[in-house]
Amino acid sequence: MSSKHFVITVERQYGSGGRLTSERLAKELGIHFYDEEILKMTSETSAIGEQYFRLADEKAGNNLLYRIVTNIKPELSEPAQNGHKITSPENLFRFQSSVIRKLAASENCIIVGRCGNYVLQDQLDNVIRIFVYADTVTRVRRIMDVDKVDEAEALRRMKRIDRTRTEYHRYFTGRNWMDMENYDLPINASRIDYDQMIVLIKDYMRLRGFLE
């Protein structure tokens, strides 16, 4: 591995295999993989109960329609440390973003979801922004396999979770979650497996000078 510092952010459609691929890639690279672990770390840092972060995890705040109409987004300023706004969705997002930035500054790692590509937008020389997607047939099949549900339930979960992630990304970034201009490496996982996705990502890392 090169000595060049890097962070990989991964956004993923539900059922695309993005999370599993990221976890396997982290093991191969010998670096940390952060997904729900960020919730616990943020809770410990902020002294706010983890349940608040879990309830708000990758979900839009209460003013989604207003934000869509006015095209505004919360500022990535320092979070409030006290007062009635301390557990607002915007403030919880600021706490979480602060943890993500600290992780990115201190180690090579993979960060899944939570608008990592947006939170680290000022560090793009050291960030690889990945978006993993796939066709409906592939995703439904993977959801059935991993979640052990029937086809109808898999389709419902896919639509519901994708809608939630889309709204979350729009609410906190003002951006279209699936706008590929916001990513360095979009990956269509419809016709390749997890191992092949890892090969593809590693090849891109070599092109960027992060792997020898």
At which residue positions do the language-model features occur?
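ATP-dependent NMP and nucleoside kinases share a basic, alpha-helical "lid"
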Residues: V99-D147
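Small-molecule kinase domains that catalyze NTP-dependent phosphoryl transfer to phosphate-bearing small molecules
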Residues: N62-I68, K73, D150-Y194
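Pre-Walker A (Motif I) flank of P-loop NTPase domains
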Residues: S3-I8, E107
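ATP-dependent small-molecule kinase phosphotransfer cores
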Residues: S43-N108
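Conserved beta-strand scaffold positions in the cores of enzyme catalytic domains, especially
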Residues: F33, V127-R129, D184-P186
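Long, contiguous binding/interaction regions
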Residues: K102, R114, Y118, Y133-V137, ...
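Short beta-strand-centered segment that lines the nucleotide-binding/catalytic pocket of NTP-utilizing
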Residues: H32-S43
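Glycine-rich phosphate-binding P-loop
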Residues: V10-E23
